[in-house]
Amino acid sequence: MLHYCRSRAFGYIRILELEGVKKGSLTAALDRIVGDIKDSDGVVIDIRNNPGGDDSTAITIINRFCDRKRVAFHRKTKIGPGEDAFTKRKTWHIEPQGDAQFTGPIVLLTCDSVFSGGEAFALAIKQLPHAFGLTLRRR
């Protein structure tokens, strides 16, 4: 699900999917990754071709890159065929969690083949003032 590497100055994190990971193993992986990259000059987070998964997994990851609590996004879910058949609006927040956060510059790599929880990840990380995104076309 998560792969990372680091040069002297920069970290690179590849998020393959946001589904099927246990919270304990995700927390341990994030502790290791953020601990290793926390003094980097910048980090590239790559979610290209991510099939998605749980919004809560996306938020858990982004929380390790937050400097303070912020609104991530609002969501309604379609629940039926009618034009107005949606759940009530739910507000999702991002906020610092874990032993360490990385709050330096972040570049998000995404493309037109990112879905579901991957889209939520992209929406939420855009709320961080130290993050910006690059959308790449698939060939």
List each language-model region with its residue ranges.
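Short acidic catalytic loops
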Residues: 13-14, 36-52, 109
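A short, well-ordered alpha-helical element
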Residues: 21-41
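Short beta-strand/loop segment at the start of cytosolic alpha/beta domains
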Residues: 1-24
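Extracytoplasmic/secreted envelope proteins and their assembly/folding machinery
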Residues: 27-34, 58-62, 103-106, 118-122, ...
